[in-house]
Amino acid sequence: MAKAYWVVCYKSIKNPEKFAAYGKLAAPAIQAAGGRFLVRAAAPAKTYEGGLNQRTVVTEFDSVAKAIAAHDSAGYQEALRVLGDSVERDLRIVEGLS
């Protein structure tokens, strides 16, 4: 079974306090669901080909099903409720190569 990854790029953070509160709830919820943070970068080391200088987070899961379950878990949904509209971001779940 191929691993899966959350790839999250933050276009803007409008409310740093809400973002910090989200992080305090999201990290344990993600880890409880089996997520392993691989990248938590405030900015890329270098961008190419029109790349944007955006905060990026990559989290590994054992499968797509587990990645989706983590997103849909009660703990992560509570973190999203706290986050509200304080950020503009793109979160996608991608399957790794098997």
Regions found by a protein language model. Give the residues of each.
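Short S/T/G/P-rich N-terminal loop/turn motif that feeds into the first structured element of a domain
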Residues: 1-56, 61-72, 95-98
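C-terminal structural segments of small proteins and small subunits
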Residues: 67-92
